[in-house]
Amino acid sequence: MTMNKANTMCLGGAQNPSVSVTEDQEGTYTVDLYLSYSDGEPVQGATYTLTDQSGAVFEGTLDNNGKASVGGVAPGEFAIEYGEDSRDFMPNVPTKTNPNFNPSANAQLIIEETKKGEVGFWENAWTRMSGAASWIWGVILGDFNDDASVEQIIANTALTMIPVVDQAADVRDLSANIMTLLSEEERDKPENWLALSLTLVGCVPTFGSAVKGTCKVALKGGKGTSKDTLLAVLRGMGKGDPEKFLRTLDWMDYAKQTSQIVSDVLKPCIEVATELASYANRMGADELGAYFLKLADEVKIIDKMVPDKLKEAMGEFDKLFARILGKGEKLIQQK
């Protein structure tokens, strides 16, 4: 940047550096710095390093208004490097509270809500069900679509039992993850547990959306993902120091939280399947009753495996992030 220009630039996906230059009487210049997020909120306490044409280096810290003045800068070009906001990272939009959350719901209530077709994004599955007023009567009469009906149970249970969700698609994705893991063969594939862990991260209160966003970027780019890319994504999702946030993530705590979240869905699913088996048997539909008991057994297996498998999956995220965060240049440069 030359002394006769004042430039405003957008860098790093979220931050907005601005510089103005004033000539001093003694032939040097004063450079006024300002750094803000794209919404205009100042970046607080970020460090800066200004190097002028003569090689002189000026270091300091922006104030809480994102500003600083640097005097005595030699004529000619200069370069500025900024650090991160000194505050702890906080997402712009914390993970959303689930308005349907009802931890006291029992199996009967979940069945009744499922019969109503409360989960809107399963409407396509409902259209595949013929004639009967509710799918449960279709079950008893033998008009039963295994996949669509079981997914409906899981989706409605998740919608009832998860306190927060990143987005509505999380419930759909969680149902699909669990459906996949009902197969013994699929339970042996690490990628299926990794997919489950990614969905569940989005359901962790406050930081779930931000962590899930960076996990998706890291998984897509793998070892080739740069630190700069990862932090730019996170910087676009909140304010504060993204690198400190990622370096201090407690992945084993995330494993514990996500294990509890999915268990809170699986256990009611077991109760629902057991209740439906009892109901089918009372109606003389013994084969269907056996199907639901088998379903309950498979879900129990998943629930038992969850803690160890999610620890392994979160451990993989920990290793991947450690490799990525070991790379990269300083994030914000202005010349």
Place the predicted regions along the sequence by residue:
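A general sequence property marking short-to-moderate contiguous segments
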Residues: 1-22
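Surface-exposed coil/turn segments at beta-strand junctions on protein surfaces, enriched
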Residues: 24-26, 63, 73
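Structural motif
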Residues: 24-43
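Short, ordered, surface-exposed loop/turn motifs in non-cytosolic proteins
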Residues: 39-53
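Short Pro-Gly-centered beta-turn/loop motif in secreted/extracellular proteins
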Residues: 43, 68-80
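Short, acidic Ser/Thr/Gly-rich low-complexity loop/linker segments typical of extracellular
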Residues: 55-67
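Cationic, glycine-rich low-complexity segments
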Residues: 81-181, 213-231, 271-282, 290-335
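Hydrophobic, membrane-inserting alpha-helical segments
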Residues: 187-246, 256-260, 290, 311
